[in-house]
Amino acid sequence: MAERTHACGKVTVEAVGQTVQLKGWVQKRRDLGGLIFIDLRDRTGIVQVVFNPETSKEALEVAETIRSEYVLHVEGTVVERGEGAINDNMATGRIEVQATKVNVLNAAKTTPIIIADDTDASEDVRLKYRYLDLRRPVMFNTFKMRHDVTKTIRNFLDTEEFLEVETPILTKSTPEGARDYLVPSRVHDGEFYALPQSPQLFKQLLMVGGFERYYQVARCFRDEDLRADRQPEFTQIDIEASFLTQDEILDMMERMMTKVMKDAKGVEVSAPFPRMKYADAMARYGSDKPDTRFEMELTDLSEFAAGCGFKVFTSAVESGGQVKAINAKGAASKYSRKDIDALTEFVKVYGAKGLAWLKVEEDGLKGPIAKFFGEEDANVLMSTLEATAGDLLLFVADKKSVVADSLGALRLRLGKELELIDESKFNFLWVTDWPLLEYDEDADRYFAAHHPFTMPFREDVELLETAPEKARAQAYDLVLNGYELGGGSLRIYERDVQEKMFKALGFSQEEAQEQFGFLLEAFEYGTPPHGGIALGLDRLVMLLAGRTNLRDTIAFPKTASASCLLTEAPSPVAEAQLEELNLKLSLKEEK
């Protein structure tokens, strides 16, 4: 078999007159009565191959048997297309290949999905036949971008003198965070490894070990409920460094991300990125990962509401809640009563009891709650919300967390429906000064907002024992267009501070020693100050490639039920394998 001389998408007019050897898949076959045209495809693109009896009867006879997705080896001569046959939409649209020989390397059945960017196959069918789905150019281009992003990050970190170090996949199960995936040990009866949710502890131990600068393209595993932007196994760019301040870490990540954007996406973004404190993000956007590509910020009306004539508002404030509103500029005529009812049902998903609304008209406020506001109150409301005729005002009165969640989500929905979002923008943002702990009323205990190894502000360390809810974290999240790209922090590196953190989280001294004794002991041997960040590679590629689902950025992903439709994993295992592990199954009976 002769060697391939050209990739299909790279045969240009410079090759006219040359004999070329091409290999690829049949994208399309057209029989035009005596002539057969084939679009031959490989990962670089498509080239048109012509089978003409005057050039080769033998090649034409073979071409008559060829169907879509056959794998071919074609030998032929490159010629310029006639003036009326030029296709400027193709890189190879000014030439075609006159076939002299063709060899079918492999035949193909009719494929269950159309191999084209605009395939109409359902996602389940695409995942079952993932190897066919991956043939689509849009999929290849996504993974080419993933490769380019990873390569750029590796090159950047190499110039910054970071070492790429692999950490264990089989490790110890520890509390906090999501559920672990467990792996039974054959050698140690009744004991289990856990697959890592992140390399957090190991990268800190590498800092104890004096490596100073570490990174890893790390596989991580979390047994959690899945969403469109979650997978049970995912990849993160894991970075840790000693002796750097928070500002130094943020500056380095900004330089890295601007290079990624330029090299992998061809987009210039400016640094430094804006910074916003967590409390401000929640107050202004109702989100800890705000999409800043459009306005429509939340406005706190609690002070006004406390003295207004609308009891729903006043009672919410009196009970310790708040009233906030968003002004959808010019949207009054775009939302009917039925549309607003749909918005009301939408905010109820986030815990809101309802959605109050007003439309601003030339002669004043109109809507079901307008009667509760006199002229003075109406003017204050209009002034505070900067409302003018044609605006739609939307209010939620509830607990602070419900107001933030519901209006934050409503803001995003309105931004999309009103086409306020410039999809060409890439708005990076740092969210800083997070709360260190969050209280869970159901569990009646505190949980770490990020993880238990996050350093509090020095002046807040003592609050861990007196008022844990007031302690602030030296933590930072990188946000892009309303998605959390990653999170990081400065780390605790002193045993006494780490023990105070564990105590605030409800760990007894014995539990802390059992779970994290190795880390606590390491802190007694001269641990340097250190910090880092972990960036979600899958999510970053999803945003840069313009995809809407993480599954499109992972070669062989899982479904929302954490199953693989291609291999049918997870699946039962043989009884002999269970016996070897000294395991017995005790399955719940289906109700």
From Swiss-Prot:
<dbReference type="Pfam" id="PF00152">
    <property type="entry name" value="tRNA-synt_2"/>
</dbReference>
<dbReference type="InterPro" id="IPR004364">
    <property type="entry name" value="Aa-tRNA-synt_II"/>
</dbReference>
<feature type="binding site">
    <location>
        <begin position="222"/>
        <end position="224"/>
    </location>
    <ligand>
        <name>ATP</name>
    </ligand>
</feature>
<feature type="site" description="Important for tRNA non-discrimination">
    <location>
        <position position="84"/>
    </location>
</feature>
<feature type="binding site">
    <location>
        <position position="231"/>
    </location>
    <ligand>
        <name>ATP</name>
    </ligand>
</feature>
<dbReference type="InterPro" id="IPR047089">
    <property type="entry name" value="Asp-tRNA-ligase_1_N"/>
</dbReference>
<feature type="binding site">
    <location>
        <position position="222"/>
    </location>
    <ligand>
        <name>L-aspartate</name>
    </ligand>
</feature>
<dbReference type="GO" id="GO:0004815">
    <property type="term" value="F:aspartate-tRNA ligase activity"/>
</dbReference>
<dbReference type="GO" id="GO:0016740">
    <property type="term" value="F:transferase activity"/>
</dbReference>
<feature type="binding site">
    <location>
        <position position="450"/>
    </location>
    <ligand>
        <name>L-aspartate</name>
    </ligand>
</feature>
<keyword id="KW-0030">Aminoacyl-tRNA synthetase</keyword>
<feature type="binding site">
    <location>
        <position position="484"/>
    </location>
    <ligand>
        <name>ATP</name>
    </ligand>
</feature>
<feature type="region of interest" description="Aspartate">
    <location>
        <begin position="200"/>
        <end position="203"/>
    </location>
</feature>
<dbReference type="GO" id="GO:0140096">
    <property type="term" value="F:catalytic activity, acting on a protein"/>
</dbReference>
<dbReference type="InterPro" id="IPR047090">
    <property type="entry name" value="AspRS_core"/>
</dbReference>
<comment type="function">
    <text>Aspartyl-tRNA synthetase with relaxed tRNA specificity since it is able to aspartylate not only its cognate tRNA(Asp) but also tRNA(Asn). Reaction proceeds in two steps: L-aspartate is first activated by ATP to form Asp-AMP and then transferred to the acceptor end of tRNA(Asp/Asn).</text>
</comment>
<dbReference type="InterPro" id="IPR004524">
    <property type="entry name" value="Asp-tRNA-ligase_1"/>
</dbReference>
<dbReference type="InterPro" id="IPR045864">
    <property type="entry name" value="aa-tRNA-synth_II/BPL/LPL"/>
</dbReference>
<comment type="subunit">
    <text>Homodimer.</text>
</comment>
<comment type="similarity">
    <text>Belongs to the class-II aminoacyl-tRNA synthetase family. Type 1 subfamily.</text>
</comment>
<dbReference type="GO" id="GO:0005524">
    <property type="term" value="F:ATP binding"/>
</dbReference>
<keyword id="KW-0648">Protein biosynthesis</keyword>
<protein>
    <recommendedName>
        <fullName>Aspartate--tRNA(Asp/Asn) ligase</fullName>
        <ecNumber>6.1.1.23</ecNumber>
    </recommendedName>
</protein>
<dbReference type="InterPro" id="IPR006195">
    <property type="entry name" value="aa-tRNA-synth_II"/>
</dbReference>
<feature type="binding site">
    <location>
        <position position="491"/>
    </location>
    <ligand>
        <name>L-aspartate</name>
    </ligand>
</feature>
<keyword id="KW-0963">Cytoplasm</keyword>
<dbReference type="InterPro" id="IPR004365">
    <property type="entry name" value="NA-bd_OB_tRNA"/>
</dbReference>
<dbReference type="InterPro" id="IPR004115">
    <property type="entry name" value="GAD-like_sf"/>
</dbReference>
<dbReference type="GO" id="GO:0006422">
    <property type="term" value="P:aspartyl-tRNA aminoacylation"/>
</dbReference>
<keyword id="KW-0067">ATP-binding</keyword>
<dbReference type="InterPro" id="IPR012340">
    <property type="entry name" value="NA-bd_OB-fold"/>
</dbReference>
<dbReference type="GO" id="GO:0003676">
    <property type="term" value="F:nucleic acid binding"/>
</dbReference>
<feature type="binding site">
    <location>
        <begin position="536"/>
        <end position="539"/>
    </location>
    <ligand>
        <name>ATP</name>
    </ligand>
</feature>
<dbReference type="InterPro" id="IPR002312">
    <property type="entry name" value="Asp/Asn-tRNA-synth_IIb"/>
</dbReference>
<keyword id="KW-0547">Nucleotide-binding</keyword>
<dbReference type="GO" id="GO:0005737">
    <property type="term" value="C:cytoplasm"/>
</dbReference>
<dbReference type="Pfam" id="PF01336">
    <property type="entry name" value="tRNA_anti-codon"/>
</dbReference>
<dbReference type="InterPro" id="IPR029351">
    <property type="entry name" value="GAD_dom"/>
</dbReference>
<dbReference type="Pfam" id="PF02938">
    <property type="entry name" value="GAD"/>
</dbReference>
<feature type="binding site">
    <location>
        <position position="176"/>
    </location>
    <ligand>
        <name>L-aspartate</name>
    </ligand>
</feature>
<dbReference type="GO" id="GO:0050560">
    <property type="term" value="F:aspartate-tRNA(Asn) ligase activity"/>
</dbReference>
<keyword id="KW-0436">Ligase</keyword>
